[in-house]
Amino acid sequence: MGKGLALDIGGTKIAVAVVTESGMLIGRQQIATPRGGAGQLAAALETLIAPYRHQVDFIAVASTGIISGGRLTALNPANLGGLADFPLYDCIRSISDLPCVLLNDGQAAAWAEYQALGDKNDNMMFVTVSTGVGGGIILNKKLLVGQRGLAGHIGHTLSDPHGVLCGCGRRGCVESVASGTAIGAETLGWKQPVSAATVFDMAQQGDAQAGKVINRSAAAIAQMLADMKMALDLEVVILGGSVGLAVGYLERVVAAQKTLPGIYRVPVQEAHHRQDSGLLGAALWARTSL
């Protein structure tokens, strides 16, 4: 199978690139994720896909949310501008008749990062901390997708039963504590609320209040990793996403892990493919599926 067109639909951006047979990304570009509903998302996808219809052999899509039966649904619709249900496969097929494979973005990233590890680990997990919190799981060298595409939605495991209400409708999910959205929300009580990116900039400059907010996020991730270690006997965790890859975040997660008994700790490292794990993983997965 020749070149593929990979797309990564996230809460803030949609990235696209041609992926060669050797796994090289060519012509990568991205746009902001539309916030205006299904019509705008469909138009954005056509803008990104149409120029490549006669240049590639297949289309591979990694997307935030639940991918099942060709549809994209969201546990937390706020992560997609309120979009709760979208006929993703049919939309893409209306743009191009090329073979198309869909996968959750955390699952796709996990597959790419698992390949990058080589044949070293049977059980690993990818964690993305970004607009939301998600992930993908490899068990016994196989990607766990699930009957309904739900596997890896670790951001909706419990962090604080008395915490804020998550966009999924449950109270105290990890996502509602640790995500970039949650970090930004923590500043609403400040004299001047700021974005998650600004919180990280402030922490880098030694701002104690900003550091405390980031530490709370990192601690929630560390506790979630402890739970996943005990449930899945993980050998390694790969950290990605805009927050997960922010300067100093990995070190804060590791520091939070060190407060736990040794059995609950798991090695954590940054994503080898950085922000492109989802793009590459979708293409790699498509090659095994088509």
Curated annotation (Swiss-Prot):
Which reaction equations make up its catalytic activity? an N-acyl-D-mannosamine + ATP = an N-acyl-D-mannosamine 6-phosphate + ADP + H(+)
GO MF term set: ATP binding; N-acylmannosamine kinase activity; zinc ion binding
Q: Which PROSITE patterns match?
A: ROK
Listed name of the protein = N-acetylmannosamine kinase
- What is the organism field in this record? Yersinia pestis (strain Pestoides F)
Q: Which family does it belong to?
A: Belongs to the ROK (NagC/XylR) family. NanK subfamily.
Which residues of this UniProt protein bind ATP?
6-13, 132-139
* One GO term of the biological process aspect: N-acetylneuraminate catabolic process
UniProt pathway: Amino-sugar metabolism; N-acetylneuraminate degradation; D-fructose 6-phosphate from N-acetylneuraminate: step 2/5
**A Pfam family matched in the record:** ROK
Kindly give the Gene3D superfamilies that the UniProt entry links to this protein: 3.30.420.40
Assembly and binders: Homodimer.
Q: List keywords of the entry alphabetically.
A: ATP-binding, Carbohydrate metabolism, Kinase, Metal-binding, Nucleotide-binding, Transferase, Zinc
Q: What is its EC number?
A: 2.7.1.60
Q: What function is annotated for this protein?
A: Catalyzes the phosphorylation of N-acetylmannosamine (ManNAc) to ManNAc-6-P.
> What does the entry list as the binding residues for Zn(2+)?
156, 166, 168, 173
Phylogenetic lineage = Bacteria, Pseudomonadati, Pseudomonadota, Gammaproteobacteria, Enterobacterales
